[in-house]
Amino acid sequence: MNIMDYENSKRFRRNKLEEDNISDDEMENEEWDEGFGAEEFISFDEELPEYDENNPTPTCFSRWFDTQKYHYHRKIPLPIQLPKEDKKQPKQHPLKWAKFTDETEIESTMVVIGKIPLTRKRNVTNENVSFQGVANEIVVSKNIEGTKKKRNYAFTTYKNKNKKITKPIQNQLCFSITKGIECPHYSCTYIHNYSQIEHCQYNNQCRFALQVDDELYLQNNNGKCLKRHMYESIESYLLRLEIPIYNCTSLVLQVNPHVHSDCNILRRVLQNAKNCRVAPLIWQKKKVLELKTSDDSDSENNDEDDDWKIDLF
């Protein structure tokens, strides 16, 4: 029997059908991995690109994979893009805003952020002046139109401008001298030494300082001159301006005998010493150089210790 006759016979056809049925049953019983081992049953299209996990566009392989997922989970999975890692920016220097960098990076320009608000002018009409309230104050009632806060601006007070409050004049000595502490200023412009005080241009003719002795000045005309006058000692400067010094336990003044005998000068100097918190105040008489005989010199040496230093407290 020829091959052609055998293929056309009934026996060949029956065996062929049995082999096909067995192969179909084996295919159904086999467990295929998702995406692996199924290349023989998938027809890839050459025009479509290859499958990419990050690319959600469907390909031939992705369609087959979605159908397998649908039969397994009974739903079509949605494409998910994997999150990308954020690029870490370099940390800024914590003191970058304070310009603590190199000198080359410091900018010399000034930037102003903000806007100056414009002051609105209020139209005041129908002023009614009534002399009520305190004797030195005048109450003025105003009818302000076009504002919501009429009650706040309904009454304004004007004080009498003739009386002016005189502020106490402060001295220019630093706290490190008057209080005995460390200088609190970074670049101190106050005085740290008596020699740094500026000299008065009027010298002994200043109207706020009265010269009583060679080195002694008193306050005059209810005013204070913060400058140093001609031949004025530091003790006289502290008493005249009534500056308290922390470590000044006693103060010695060198005056002539006629100044010590004046009661008016003595009273004013003692009052300034109390305000300066100085105790005791010692008056020291100056020596007068004169030609004297030998008899007079012996009598003066006996009284020299009593008249040289006098404690007034």
UniProtKB/Swiss-Prot annotation:
Instruction: Offer an example of a GO molecular function term for this protein.
Output: zinc ion binding
Where in this protein does the record put region Disordered?
Answer: 294-313
Query: What keywords does the record list, in alphabetical order?
Result: Metal-binding, Zinc, Zinc-finger
Cite the InterPro entries for this sequence. Answer: Zn_finger_prot (IPR045410)
The answer to whether UniProt assigns keyword Ribonucleoprotein to this entry is no
**Compositional bias (Acidic residues) spans?**
296-313
Where are the zinc-finger regions (C3H1-type) in this chain? 174-199
Is Metal-binding included in the keywords of this UniProt record?
yes
> Could you say which protein family the record assigns here?
Belongs to the IIV-6 077L family.
Name of the protein described by the UniProt record = Putative zinc finger protein 077L
Q: Which organism is it from?
A: Invertebrate iridescent virus 6
Which taxonomic lineage does the organism of this UniProt entry have?
Viruses, Varidnaviria, Bamfordvirae, Nucleocytoviricota, Megaviricetes
